[in-house]
Regions:
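Mixed-charge (Asp/Glu-Lys/Arg
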Residues: 1-184
């Protein structure tokens, strides 16, 4: 059975530093999505994006940023922060043409009848487009869909399962295998 992603469990499990845990989760999902099997080089305090940009199979140079916001944070209040990250990445990383923002929240739909996206989201995307950077979003629904895939089940358990049984079982299985192989 594939249990749903429980964001409250994530908050509980990583209550000491949920932002760092979310950055780690976003890194794993980004590497998976763009087939970066061995990870992506990064610097300590990497500016504007989480790692060096990745070259994709379809010819793009993509960077990502993870943004973990507490429940009281309005996405509209983060517009300038996101624009600053876009501008900084454009200036720092030659050739970058796409930035993916992993966010633990969903945008609120526009209150206008003829629009789905809120104005602040449209302004952020337009700002990126004017700099030659496509902006993509990976919100809760995207993350939950990715973590529903069988091959990412271990990631979901690592970040969203407060029971330590699976982690201990996996560790004991590896130790058992190593002890057997050690004597061969």
């Amino acid at each position: 059975m594939n249990n749903p992603v429980d964001w409250k469990a994530f908050e509980y499990k990583f209550s000491g530093d949920p932002r760092a845990a979310f950055e780690s989760l976003a890194y794993i999902l980004f590497c998976y999505e763009f087939k970066q099997t061995y990870g992506i080089f990064r610097y300590y305090n990497q500016p504007y994006i989480e790692t060096q940009p990745a070259n994709t199979a379809d010819g793009h140079k993509v960077g990502f940023q993870a943004k973990y916001y507490d429940a009281g944070t309005q996405m509209s209040s983060k517009e300038q922060d996101l624009k600053d990250a876009i501008k900084g990445a454009k200036n720092k990383y030659a050739g970058i043409d796409r930035i993916i923002f992993y966010i633990n929240k969903e945008f609120s739909a526009s209150s206008a009848k003829d629009k789905d996206k809120p104005e602040h989201q449209l302004r952020i995307e337009k700002y990126g487009k004017n700099l030659g950077i496509e902006i993509q979003w990976r919100g809760q629904s995207h993350i939950e869909k990715m973590l529903a895939m069988e091959e990412l089940k271990y990631v979901k358990n690592l970040y969203f399962n407060v029971e330590t049984g699976i982690d201990h079982f996996h560790e004991s299985l590896i130790n058992h295998k190593n002890s057997i192989l050690k004597h061969i």
